[in-house]
Amino acid sequence: MTLRQALGEAVRRLAAGGVERPRLEAEVLLGWACSLTRPRLLARLEEELAPAAAGRFWQAIDRRAAGYPLQYLTGHQEFMSLDFKVTPAVLIPRQDTEVVVEAVLERLDPCESYTIADCGTGSGAIALSLAHYLPRARVYATDISPAALTVAQENARKLGLAARVTLLQGDFLAPLRGLKLDALVANPPYIPTAALPGLPADVRSEPRLALDGGPDGLDAYRFLLPGAAGLLRPGGLLALEIGSDQGQAVKDLARAVGAYRNEQVLPDYAGRDRCFLAYRREE
C-alpha cells in the first residue's frame, strides 16, 4: 500500500468516526507514524508504507476515530507559536487560551522585570509562553499533579526556560504564599459538573481535574479571586480564562471581593467571553 492509498483509507475511517477535519488529521498522523514533516510526506505519497510505520499509523487512526485526542496520539501541541509536549496527564492547550496570554503580553513591557504566577499550569503552556515573550520575567507555575509537573518540566527544558520558571506542587495558590506578584494568570476548571458527560469524547479524555468547575462551573473563581488579592502587588494584573457564558458572574464575584479595579471581560476569536482581567486596587 502506498502512502497515498493509506491516506485515502485513513480519511474514510476518520470521517466515519465523526472527525471534523479528516484529511488534515490523517496527514498529521501519517507524518507522525513515518517520522516525516507534512511537506515531506506530501512529496512522497507514491512510496510504500513501511510495515513498522503501518502498525503505528492504523492503531492511531482507529483510536482517533474512536474519539481519542489527536494531540495525545502525537504527543505535541502548538501554542503561542511554541511546541509543547502533551500527555493524558495534562489539559491540551487551546487557541482560546492564547487570548489570555496575549492580553497579559499587551499589558506588560517585555523590557521590564516581573514576578508572575500561573496557577494550575498543566503542560506549562501559559507559564512558559509568558517566560518566552517576557525575557526578564520570573515565573512561578503551580499544579497539584506530579505527572503534570513532569510534563511542564520537560517543556521548560526543551524551550530553554527552566532557569526562569519555577515549578511548584500544590493546589492553585498554596505554593505561592509569601510571594508578591506583578501578575497572576490561570486557566482554572470552569465546566459545570453536570455538563461533563455531554462533552465530546476527545474532551472527556482530558483530566477531569482540569475540567470540572463544580455545580455552576464557578468554584475555582470563588477561591482564586480572594486568594489572588493577597498575592498581587497594588496595581498587579489578574488574568483568568473563563467559560463562554461566565463573564458577568466572574465580574460579580470579583466586585464582591472588593480588592480589584478595572474589571473587564475580553472575547475569544469567536466573540465569546473568554478572559477576565482586573487590577489589584492600590492601598
From Swiss-Prot:
Highest rank taxon of the organism: Bacteria
Catalytic activity, reaction form: L-glutaminyl-[peptide chain release factor] + S-adenosyl-L-methionine = N(5)-methyl-L-glutaminyl-[peptide chain release factor] + S-adenosyl-L-homocysteine + H(+)
Annotated positions binding S-adenosyl-L-methionine: 120-124, 143, 172, 187
Annotated substrate binding sites: 187-190
Claim: Secreted is one of the keywords in the record: no
Keywords: Methyltransferase, S-adenosyl-L-methionine, Transferase
GO biological processes: methylation
Keyword Lipid metabolism: no
Top class in the EC scheme: transferase
EC number annotated for this UniProt entry: 2.1.1.297
One of the Pfam families matching this protein, by short name: PrmC_N
CDD domains according to UniProt: AdoMet_MTases
SUPFAM superfamilies in the record: S-adenosyl-L-methionine-dependent methyltransferases (SSF53335)
MF terms in GO: nucleic acid binding; protein-(glutamine-N5) methyltransferase activity; protein-glutamine N-methyltransferase activity
The protein's role, per its UniProt record: Methylates the class 1 translation termination release factors RF1/PrfA and RF2/PrfB on the glutamine residue of the universally conserved GGQ motif.
Family (UniProt): Belongs to the protein N5-glutamine methyltransferase family. PrmC subfamily.
NCBIfam families the UniProt entry points to: hemK_fam (TIGR00536), RF_mod_PrmC (TIGR03534)
Protein name (Swiss-Prot/TrEMBL): Release factor glutamine methyltransferase
Protein's organism: Moorella thermoacetica (strain ATCC 39073 / JCM 9320)
Lineage: Bacteria, Bacillati, Bacillota, Clostridia, Moorellales
Gene this protein is translated from: prmC
